[in-house]
Swiss-Prot record:
Superkingdom, natural source: Eukaryota
Biased composition range(s): Basic and acidic residues: 89-98, 160-171
Name listed for the protein in its UniProt record: Protein XAP5 CIRCADIAN TIMEKEEPER
Keywords, sorted A to Z: Biological rhythms, Coiled coil, Nucleus
Family to which this protein belongs: Belongs to the FAM50 family.
């Protein structure tokens, strides 16, 4: 063993070490192939996810939003669903980046293994030289500034982000405008109302207005419809006509749209149904609340003042949007 000739192959221990290194290289090669396969399988899925974000957003929003909702609820649900989907996309991207970093680390290890010498005692020589270099470089590192990198796995969605906040604000404004357009379409929809002109007896009629019309506008149309037949309606003003729905006197400034969107409740039935129907469920099950809708009454104010102590006028009271009626009644106060 006087030199390092090309024909020298080492001792039996060296041969064992060489075989062990070859096995390690083979095992690492298999791991790298597995990481490559995982990376290639994950990428198309991410692209596919990103391409269908708008479809997923619309589907999730339709499931969350049923019937009429207020503007604030509409905007809040839309933004919450969009934020949730964006966070899921970000998590998928971070996971893919982490797998890519692990793959690059395995490649660096593989290059270092390929550079190892075949002779065992060369390890000691190189290790010694590495230690000397490390000792020489260590004082220099202490004097230089320490640079810290970013950890891609850390959650940062809670941190302030001007660009993201600007995008969210723009999305809110867009949704508000969209909501306003949709509500205008609803207000212009026709609404058929069954009512009864009440002068002690009922005279039932049907009239059509818009959902956005106020009670005052509705009573003006009623006056025009009843004027040819009833002299007292023809000679009075719209301000002296009252609209009584489910034993509540609805003030002129309220609109049908307001009653519908808030699903307002009266003393004897819902205020957002303007047809007439009976609830057949109560025949089979008396424990269920009736959902019957009764024809609203149009009354001349002078008649009401003269008969408000007599049933049914004795049950009537002014509608208050803040007052909640927990159950429907047709008798008593």
């Amino acid at each position: 063993m006087s030199g390092f000739g090309d024909g020298y192959v080492g001792t039996a221990q060296d041969a064992v070490k060489i075989r062990r290194l070859e096995k390690q290289r083979e095992a690492e090669r298999r791991k790298i192939e597995e990481l490559k396969n995982k990376s290639s399988d994950g990428q198309p899925g991410l692209l596919q996810f990103g391409s269908s974000t708008s479809e997923i957003l619309e589907t999730a929003f339709k499931k969350e939003t049923v019937g009429l909702v207020t503007r604030e609820q509409y905007v809040e649900k839309r933004v919450n669903i969009r934020t949730k989907i964006e966070e899921e996309e970000k998590e998928k991207l971070q996971k893919l980046q982490q797998e890519e970093e692990e793959l690059q680390m395995q490649k660096r290890k593989k290059r270092r293994v390929r550079g190892d010498p075949r002779l065992s005692f060369c390890d000691e020589i190189e290790n010694g030289s590495d230690e000397d270099e490390f000792e020489n470089q260590e004082p220099q590192k202490k004097h230089g500034p320490v640079k810290l990198g970013k950890d891609p796995t850390v959650e940062t969605s809670f941190l302030p982000d001007r660009e993201r906040e600007a995008e969210e604000q723009a999305e809110r404004e867009r949704l508000k405008k969209q909501w306003s357009r949709e509500q205008e379409l609803i207000k212009n929809e026709p609404l058929t109302i069954t009512y009864s002109y009440w002068d002690g007896t009922g005279h039932r009629r049907v009239i059509q207005v818009r959902k956005g019309d106020s009670i005052g506008e509705f009573l003006r149309a009623v006056q025009q419809q009843l004027a040819p037949e009833f002299r007292e309606v023809r000679t009075t003003s719209v301000e002296n006509l009252l609209y009584v729905k489910e034993d509540l006197i609805i003030p002129h400034q309220h609109s049908f749209y307001e009653l519908i969107i808030n699903k307002a409740r009266g003393k004897s039935g819902p205020l957002f149904h303007f047809d007439v129907h009976e609830d057949v469920r109560t025949i089979a099950d008396a424990t269920k609340e009736k959902d019957e809708s009764h024809a609203g009454k149009v009354v001349e104010r002078h008649w009401y003042e003269k008969n408000k102590h007599i049933f049914p006028a004795s049950r009537w009271e002014i509608y208050d949007p803040t007052k909640k009626w927990e159950r429907y009644t047709i008798h008593g106060d």
